[in-house]
Swiss-Prot record:
GO terms for biological process: 1,6-anhydro-N-acetyl-beta-muramic acid catabolic process; amino sugar metabolic process; peptidoglycan turnover. The keyword Protein transport does not apply. The lineage of its organism: Bacteria, Pseudomonadati, Pseudomonadota, Gammaproteobacteria, Moraxellales. Transmembrane segments: none annotated. Belongs to the anhydro-N-acetylmuramic acid kinase family. This is Anhydro-N-acetylmuramic acid kinase. InterPro entries: Anhydro_N_Ac-Mur_kinase (IPR005338), ATPase_NBD (IPR043129). Keywords: ATP-binding, Carbohydrate metabolism, Kinase, Nucleotide-binding, Transferase. ATP binds at residues 32-39.
Length: 427
C-alpha cells in the first residue's frame, strides 16, 4: 500500500471511529452457551470519569431466540447434532448449509434486538460508536487451535447503521491462547480495587473465575487503571459446567427451560457417589489456564455418565430432582475448590457472582457453604446487575479494539502476548 492510500485509510478510520472516546456510546451483545436468548446493553464509557465506575449502563434489552433458530443452534453445537433436524422444503439439508443459514438468521435476529434497544432508549444509531457482538459459539476446540462463533457482522452493520466488532477469540488463539475466557480482562478494568483482592465468579453456561489482585495506588491516582491495558497479574479460567447442564436436565424432565431459583434442585438430594463420578471428568484435573464448553459437558455426556453409574451402582435409587441437586453441587464444588486456592492466600473477603446463575438462590447457598472464608454476593453490590455483566464486557472489548488496546490477558488465556482482538465491520 503506498503512502497516499495509507494516509487516506488512516484519515477515514479516525473520522469514522477513532473519536469521542471520552464519552462514547457502545452496545454489547452476548448469547452464551446456555442459549437462553440474547442480551444487549447500551453503555457509556468515560476516560474523564474519576469515580470508581467509569462505565454507565444506559439501557438494556433481552430477547428469547426464535424457537427454530434456537433448535438449530443447539444442533450445531453437537457433533452430528444436525442429523436430528427435520428440514422443511426451503431449509438446508447439510451441516455446512445449516451453518450458513443460522449465521444469517442469528445476525438478523441480533439486528432486531439492537434496533429494539435503540428504539426503547430513544437513541440515534449515529451516536453509537460500535456494537461488540460475540456471536454464538458452536465449537470451541482450543486443543486444536480454533473456536467458531457464528454471526454475520455484515448484516448487523447494514441493518443497524452501526459498525460491528466481532470474532474476538481467534486473534488470541493465533498467538497461542485458548481464546477464553476473555471477560476477566473487563473484570480487571472495572472491578479491581487498591485495598484487596477480589474474586469474580461468572455463572453462565460454563462457570469461570477471575482473581483480581489489588491494583497499585499509583494507577488509581493517575486514573490509568480502568482504561489502559489490563494487567497480566489477573488469574482467570473456566472451572466447569454451570447453567449448561442444569438447564439441559431441567428441559428434559420438566416443562420449564430452567430451574428458577434452584427450587427443583433444592427439592432433591445430592447423590454423593454420582457426584464423585462426575468430578472424575479429565477437565477438573487440568491446571490453568484452561477453558471448556459444550464439547466437554453436554446432555449426551451426562446421560452416558448416568448409564455407567446405574450399571456400577444398581442398588442406588435416585430421582430426576436428585440429579438436578447433584449437578448444582457439581457446579458449586468445582467452582469453590478453585476459588479457595486463592482465598486462602489472599486478603479477599468476598466473591462477586455474575451471570444467570447468580439468580439461582439454591446454587448461591451451596457456594456459600463451600466458601466459608468469604461472603458470596452478586455484582449488583458493585453497581452492575449480574445478568448484564457479559454483554457490557463485549461492549468494553469492542471499545478496546477501536482504541487499539489489547483485550486479552495472556496469563488467563495462555497467549504468548497481549493482542488487539476482533474484526471490525464498518457501517
Amino acid at each position: 500500500m503506498d503512502d497516499l492510500n495509507y494516509a487516506t485509510l488512516t484519515d477515514a478510520l479516525e473520522q469514522t471511529v477513532f473519536e469521542n472516546f471520552d464519552d462514547g456510546l457502545y452496545i454489547g451483545m452476548m448469547s452464551g452457551t446456555s442459549l437462553d436468548g440474547m442480551d444487549a446493553v447500551l453503555c457509556q464509557f468515560s476516560e474523564k470519569d474519576n469515580t470508581q465506575q467509569p462505565m454507565h449502563v444506559l439501557a438494556t434489552h433481552s430477547q428469547d431466540f426464535p424457537p427454530r433458530l434456537r433448535e438449530v443452534l443447539l444442533a450445531l453445537c453437537q457433533p452430528n447434532g444436525i442429523q436430528a433436524l427435520t428440514p422443511s422444503d426451503d431449509e438446508p439439508n447439510s451441516e455446512l448449509d445449516w451453518f450458513g443459514w443460522a449465521s444469517k438468521e442469528y445476525a438478523e435476529f441480533s439486528s432486531d434486538v439492537v434496533n429494539t434497544l435503540l428504539q426503547q432508549s430513544n437513541t440515534d444509531s449515529e451516536s453509537v460508536l460500535a456494537i461488540g457482538c460475540h456471536g454464538q459459539t458452536v465449537r470451541h476446540r482450543p486443543q486444536m487451535g480454533f473456536s467458531l462463533q457464528l454471526v454475520d457482522a455484515n448484516i448487523i452493520a447494514e441493518r443497524t447503521g452501526i459498525s460491528v466488532v466481532s470474532d474476538f477469540r481467534r486473534r488470541d488463539m493465533a498467538v497461542g491462547g485458548q481464546g477464553a475466557p476473555l471477560v476477566p480482562a473487563f473484570h480487571q478494568a472495572l472491578f479491581a480495587v487498591p485495598d484487596s483482592t477480589r474474586v469474580l465468579l461468572n455463572l453462565g453456561g460454563i462457570a469461570n473465575i477471575a482473581v483480581l489482585p489489588a491494583i497499585s495506588n499509583d494507577l488509581v491516582d493517575s486514573n490509568e487503571h480502568s482504561e489502559n491495558q489490563p494487567s497480566d497479574s489477573v488469574v482467570g479460567y473456566d472451572t466447569g459446567p454451570a447453567n449448561l447442564l442444569l438447564d439441559a436436565w431441567t428441559t428434559l424432565h420438566t416443562d420449564k427451560d430452567y430451574d428458577a431459583g434452584g427450587t427443583w434442585a433444592q427439592s432433591g438430594q445430592v447423590v454423593e457417589p454420582l457426584l464423585n463420578q462426575l468430578l472424575e471428568h479429565p477437565f477438573f484435573k487440568k491446571t490453568y489456564p484452561k477453558s471448556t464448553g459444550r464439547e466437554d459437558f453436554n446432555l449426551a455426556w451426562l446421560q452416558d455418565e448416568l448409564q455407567k453409574f446405574d450399571q456400577a451402582s444398581a442398588d442406588v435409587r435416585y430421582s430426576s430432582a436428585d440429579v438436578q441437586a447433584t449437578l448444582t453441587e457439581l457446579t458449586a464444588i468445582s467452582a469453590s475448590a478453585q476459588i479457595n486456592l486463592f482465598i486462602n492466600a489472599s486478603s479477599s473477603n468476598a466473591v462477586y457472582v455474575c451471570g444467570g446463575g447468580a439468580l439461582n438462590n439454591y446454587l448461591m447457598t451451596r457456594l456459600q457453604v463451600h466458601l466459608q472464608r468469604c461472603k458470596v454476593e452478586t455484582t449488583a453490590s458493585l453497581g452492575l446487575e449480574p445478568t448484564w455483566v457479559e454483554a457490557v464486557a463485549f461492549a468494553w472489548l469492542a471499545r478496546q479494539t477501536l482504541m487499539g488496546e489489547t483485550g486479552n490477558l495472556p496469563a488467563v488465556t495462555g497467549a504468548s502476548k497481549g493482542v488487539v482482538l476482533g474484526q471490525v465491520c464498518f457501517a
